[in-house]
């Protein structure tokens, strides 16, 4: 038996899906529509698998495309009662302090509520170091308009956070210091914002500094826009002059209002509302992931189209071919400083979604039937790598809670779920892993977090990730900006010259006698540079860097001139042994400290390593030929985790435990011979 279906056209008609339940994806009963059409049109004949009890009538008609005006209208729908902005800046230009003032003036807190400084830096590590590491969401309401604010990291090593955040917003507040002007990270974040086509409001912060030069800063920022190929509309940016700590802003540096009103007005006026498809199929890109012990993984992102409701069944897509189904158990929006439960979220708003197991950054939460994935987030490649391995020192297992390679592997894989800019690969042995990141600070923050969580492990020295293109070896280069007093400029210039740095700009700043030096330098030359540059400038220089590009191999670079003092045997250090050892260099350990053979206990005052016995005791006899001499020991050097990672060389390791940080020689390399 055959099923007949009449058509009004000799050419294959495009079947509407709603025409009949038998029609699906240009097929009828599983047979291709085009292949069943006989030449000359008329009837379609499909073989039936079994006799039909009664005739079935199907209709087919050509689909008509939507008018161009309707498509255009969909694209131009804007939501005027919402603004999504990110605050971006170079490190220490005052953006987190500015957010504090914005939250206070928007009445986010009670008048009698006591709040700490830098409210958005809630992480312990952020508060200790005075930097923003993770992006944070909050919102304020100004004149019936909800303003979603995202505070972003200012350090170039956490650029991956900035790149993710820019997917959620429609505009940025570019905060620039009134003295320093645009810095390396300013260039990086502005470049990304312009690539997204975002509107930019420039905030010249710290305008109350005595040496402020607002006109120079605005002109320099405009030149930066031109260099980054900004459009005419983007170059016509609004400049706001502000003092974040005082909570004042204005359109002129000489005429500041008593509050941040001019800044809020500029946000509403210059940043457009989100571009949405309110009636379209649901689409939301998971831009950030948080974890809650009770709710599990929480996906954060902006709703691009449709309406998301609590209890809704959705499709979670990684790509066109990889999708799974889930149900939204809880839904939150950001109001003031908190997450607030809600039953539904409209397109254009930023929300947090619970109930989707194993949701990953870059996945799309879409409509169950018509959903399609959004473009995934692209993040720049890592430039530095370090080896992580199980602790093999004689003191292993004494202080840590998680010490096995399985513990280490699971923790590193868990980090990859949130940290898009990081990569983890297997090393040469089963208990070694290679972790790649955007810089040494990027990886050091991970090490510090793991240490505080109870992990015990060893890390090797940072190494740059080179590329080979057309049989040419390329290495990463960075732009380094050094702020140094003129009196110490000579040693700093000499040091950067030894590190293969090439100066391309030098500027003097006002009456403070400070000089800005700009260099293009290999990333290898920056390893261990921070301590060296502080020593050369007597603690007065400020170094900032940002990745520039890959370039030709610059040749050999010597990063450390002095060797190490290495413990000769296991034991406990004594004052008697340290008194003679300190004549050989500066010590890392004091009296009464347990040490092991191969541990680095000091800095040798000459090139090459020197083995010392700092555990020997004074022989006791019954004869007193002379009186006892009082031993005076120098104060040992205290090295932080960052300092230790900068100090070690190819054949050395840092032992990291929850309560101690030690350096030692790599015994595996010692057996092979120093390479």
Swiss-Prot record:
GO biological process terms held by the UniProt record: protein stabilization; response to cold; rRNA processing
Entry keyword set: Chloroplast, Elongation factor, Plastid, Protein biosynthesis, Stress response, Transit peptide
Biased composition (Low complexity): 59-68
Subcellular location: Plastid, Chloroplast
Record region (Disordered): 43-76
GO molecular function: GTP binding; GTPase activity; translation elongation factor activity
Consequences of knocking out this gene: Reduced plant growth, pale-green leaves with reduced levels of chlorophyll. Chilling-sensitive phenotype.
GO terms under cellular component: chloroplast
Transit peptide (first-last residue): 1-58
Chloroplast is among the record's keywords: yes
Protein role: Putative chloroplastic elongation factor involved in response to chilling stress. Required for proper chloroplast rRNA processing and/or translation at low temperature. Involved in plastid protein homeostasis.
The name this protein goes by in its record: Putative elongation factor TypA-like SVR3, chloroplastic
Organism: Arabidopsis thaliana (Mouse-ear cress)
